[in-house]
Amino acid sequence: MSKTILITGAGSGFGKGAAIGMAKNGHNIIATVQVSPQVTPLREEAEQLGLKNFRVERLDLTDPYDIRQAQSWDFDILWNNAGQGEAGPVWEIPVDLVRRNFEINVFLPLVLTQGVIQRWVREGNSNGKKVVFTSSMGGLFTPANWGTYVSTKHALESIAEALQQELATYGIRIQTINPGAYYTGYNETMADNPFRWLDDKKNFTKRADLRKGFDDFFATPEGKMDPKEMIDRMIEVVPADTGKFRNVVPKVIEDMLKQHQIAAWDNQI
């Protein structure tokens, strides 16, 4: 059955790839992008692909008027996919960057989601609706120097789990999607962010040491996986009426996370 799906952060990466894929499968897509210059190129790409069921709109989560407008649209599934990441040592990162990362990844998606859900319930058509959150493998464990970003994903995991319990009565389904470190440019850009503020004259963490740690990770197979695998899974998961609450891809990362969580019980100080 065809669904109407609103996607945030559809201007690039997972969101764009999955939006196009779901449209090709017959779903009606409202693909939203952060800034106006992204709108026309994505519309033109959809037209070139012959996708008449692909609508592109601007939705800047920092703009309350954009959020209010999006909350008035009719759709069956809200996919909160937009996000931003700050990396670097938690003990030295400027707190205003931590606060901003939570604003983009947690608070503003929650504002959008609350308004959408409350409208569904108020209008009596909540049964069968769905909200999906793009979390991360980092929503389930915390590697050094990624603590700020993954703490926002830990928060999303808690919000999603609470919503699943709170909204069952209303027939609203909740899911998370937890990608591994796929090569979309997102993680690579995030790894560049600390070098805006990290200063060898002021900070204890040295730029060269942090850069080497990031570069070593991205040089491994786990640090540059082909995103097609994840996009294909998103195309299946997001429109589905049934499925798992939490969807970790690939399987090797799911297994690693399970082992990490078991081992955490014996972690020593």
Regions found by a protein language model. Give the residues of each.
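Conserved glycine-rich cofactor-binding loop
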Residues: 11-13
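Conserved Rossmann-fold cofactor-binding substructure of NAD(P)-dependent oxidoreductases
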Residues: 61-74
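Substrate-binding pocket helix/loop in short-chain dehydrogenase/reductase
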Residues: 89-90, 97-100
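Active-site helix of classical SDR
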Residues: 113, 152-155
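A short, exposed helix-loop element centered on a Lys and neighboring polar residues
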Residues: 113-114, 161
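Residue(s) in the substrate-gating loop at a strand-loop-helix junction
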Residues: 136
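SDR active-site lid
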Residues: 169-242
